[in-house]
Amino acid sequence: MDENKSKALQAALSQIEKQFGKNTVMRLGDNTVQAVEAVSTGSLTLDIALGIGGLPKGRIIEIYGPESSGKTTMTLQAIAQCQKSGGTCAFIDAEHALDPQYARKLGVDIDNLLVSQPDNGEQALEIADMLVRSGAIDLIVVDSVAALTPKAEIEGEMGDSHMGLQARLMSQALRKITGNAKRSNCMVIFINQIRMKIGVMFGSPETTTGGNALKFYASVRLDIRRIGQVKEGDEIVGSETKVKVVKNKMAPPFKEAIFQILYGKGTNQLGELVDLAVQQDIVQKAGAWYSYQGNKIGQGKNNVIRYFEENTQIAEEIERNIREQLLTTGTNGAVQIEDEEEPDLLLES
């Protein structure tokens, strides 16, 4: 750089530091790059599809999909995983529909979960921002964007038009929350619903509520869909679920994860572990028999799941190996669970 330009730059940087504080402007190479902390989603397959082993802390996340597709289940599992690692979590229940007993079944410590049921959208987002700014919260869930009703709409008449009020509210709130979340390393997950655009001839007519602001501010956007049923005999015990990573600022996007959500239990974590271990040749499969490090561990997938339930240390060791292999080397295309054997038989725990 020219000497005069260099002096001018130094003078400008000194003035900026004096006015706004140290490290307001810095050279990118001066600081060592720190790995982004991730919170597991409770599904190993989805953690791998996200590329960093889970959802990133300090970022805005959007999870959207049709009704009863597993959106709240996914966020409650993320809360449970965050609490296991010593984190403090909050759930802003704008829909007034949180079931404490179901949350407990998914592993959430409900005695230490902060819950708020706000009266209107402004109150919900103000509470979220204050919790983020406190620096004491690791994960906040807002359920859901569609239920963040502006105060003017609540106080108005039923037939009144309130065009764009919710979109403006979300845009204003996200401008504040995004920077605060990064500074306090707090993850904020927004659950969103799907609506249909009228008169769309080409392309998908689906859109999410709350305007476009959340689409821009979110570092990760997950589209969750129920694609089938899980049966045990004639009884339906869960749903086959597909999650597409629609947007990902942390790793390559557009990967997919297919896994099972069992009613009242959450994701079929050990079932995923068995399939991924076979896929990565960590566990060997010959006919119906599965073996690990030369020792047979079970005949049939359900017996292997039972073996992992009884030998948690081995299950954790295999999971670590899978994460090391797939998150280091990366995966191409969709990360899927292919259930070759016993497709509709699941272990009742």
From Swiss-Prot:
Q: What is its main location?
A: cytoplasm
Specify which residues bind ATP according to the UniProt entry for this protein.
65-72
State where the protein is found. Answer: Cytoplasm
CDD domains assigned: RecA
Source taxon at top rank:
Bacteria
One GO molecular-function annotation for this sequence? ATP binding
Identify the GO cellular component terms for this protein.
cytosol
GO terms, biological process: DNA recombination; DNA repair; SOS response
Cite the entry's keywords alphabetically. ATP-binding, Cytoplasm, DNA damage, DNA recombination, DNA repair, DNA-binding, Nucleotide-binding, SOS response
According to the UniProt record, which cysteines are disulfide-bonded? none
Briefly, what is this protein's role? Can catalyze the hydrolysis of ATP in the presence of single-stranded DNA, the ATP-dependent uptake of single-stranded DNA by duplex DNA, and the ATP-dependent hybridization of homologous single-stranded DNAs. It interacts with LexA causing its activation and leading to its autocatalytic cleavage.
As for family, the record states:
Belongs to the RecA family.
Query: What protein am I looking at?
Result: Protein RecA
State the organism named in the record: Acinetobacter baumannii (strain ATCC 17978 / DSM 105126 / CIP 53.77 / LMG 1025 / NCDC KC755 / 5377)
Gene that encodes the chain:
recA
